[in-house]
Amino acid sequence: MDELRLKVAVQKSGRLADPSVDLLVRCGLKLSRGKDQLVGYGENLPLDVLFVRDDDIPDLVQQDVCDLGLVGLNVLEEKRLELSARGHPARFQCVRTLDFGRCRLALAIPQGSPWDGTRSLRGRRIATSYPFLLAHYLRERDIDAEIVTLSGAVEIAPRLGRADLICDLVATGSTLQANHLREVETVLESHAVLIRTPLDLPAAKHEWVQRLLLRVDGVQQVRESKYIMLHAPRSALPEIRRLLPGSESPTIIPLEGCADRVAVHAVCRENVFWETLESLKRVGASALLVLPVEKMLA
């Protein structure tokens, strides 16, 4: 691989795989990748994408094999605690919080089991794929419990007699329900993050990292943004500006032949609901139009 091209590690399969690639594509990347290939080539940007296991991503960035990585905060913090326990500092840097991959690492007990807060954990066996995060959680609360480390199928551990309860990732909770478990405590709120190597990169690479970060910011702002256009009486402008959700100063344009009315254009960085439009109309707005924003650079 060309050392002057950025190397970005993403999950090859799983809940973060498609959103990670989609983010890069929305940042302008045209990715060439054959079926089952583990490396994708950026045709229009000096960037290659490595498709790997999610728990390998922090290591690849830590060891400077990859310049950037998109990974879940749960995986990143588990690796950080593991490195610390082994006397090694975590060298990767978290540079962006991403707006996908939201879930939580949670404790769950069999349905019907009593729960009296975290004191119920004392002396219990807890199955998990995140032993370092769980150990950190227990240590902070001075709780002595046995951690049973499993690489998968954690949710069936209580039914197999391997554990009394579990600590696992929860998104919708449907898997817990299917296995007759109920969530009782949150250990960590998680989401996708973008990490980078701490190395001083060559100037060309550094420039592309900065450009990519700027594009990521733009993509995430666009997802939350709408462009609103409307007509309104000049006298209603203070109230209209108050009602526009999350907008900066709007653009005010005089209307031809209507001295007392103007056109208002604004980018709103929050959701625009029907109730918002109805409130705007009540204070005198008309010809309201809400458009999606395709690209934005702050």
List where the protein language model places each region:
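Signature of uroporphyrinogen-III synthase
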Residues: 59, 104-108
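Short, structured active-site "lid" loops
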Residues: 46-68
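Small-molecule-sensing regulatory modules
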Residues: 1-47, 71-92, 97-99, 104, ...
